[in-house]
Amino acid sequence: MPRSRINGNFIDKTSSIVANILLRIIPTTSGEKEAFTYYRDGMSAQSEGNYAEALQNYYEAMRLEIDPYDRSYILYNIGLIHTSNGEHTKALEYYFRALERNPFLPQAFNNMAVICHYRGEQAIRQGDSEIAEAWFDQAAEYWKQAIALTPGNYIEAHNWLKITRRFE
């Protein structure tokens, strides 16, 4: 049984009903509909912390989905799961792949910046200030891209860029 039919959350049920109606009225292929169902079930599992199930659904959605824009969101969500699991190298790979298909994902740039900033802080704790600065510089570049796409968002990142004199 698809996850969308067993979820007990009222908002999720409402979203599922709306999504099902849209799938019926918008002209799409059966493959696109099936891909969306897997994507939606992946999001549901992910929101409940069932990352293994979410990944299975996302991988199946990737197999079926042909639209690069839609694939970018699947890849982004896979990146989120790897970030949550502390698998930062894998997460960065998926964020890059998402941005290759859709360069207008500020949230991917932000998450990449957060990972780079975290790695910079790790380098400081290990006493390697040169490596830390390189990670911080990379974080700054990603945050600048996120801010350029959505001015007014990422206020903390914007302040960090100003404080560290990395904002141009």
From Swiss-Prot:
It comes from the Eukaryota. One of its GO terms (biological process) is photosynthesis. Keywords: Chloroplast, Membrane, Photosynthesis, Plastid, Repeat, Thylakoid, TPR repeat. Disulfide bonds: none annotated. Its main location: plastid. The keyword Repeat applies. TPR repeats lie at residues 35-68, 72-105, 120-153. Belongs to the Ycf3 family. HAMAP family: Ycf3. Essential for the assembly of the photosystem I (PSI) complex. May act as a chaperone-like factor to guide the assembly of the PSI subunits. This is Photosystem I assembly protein Ycf3. It comes from Ceratophyllum demersum. The gene is ycf3.
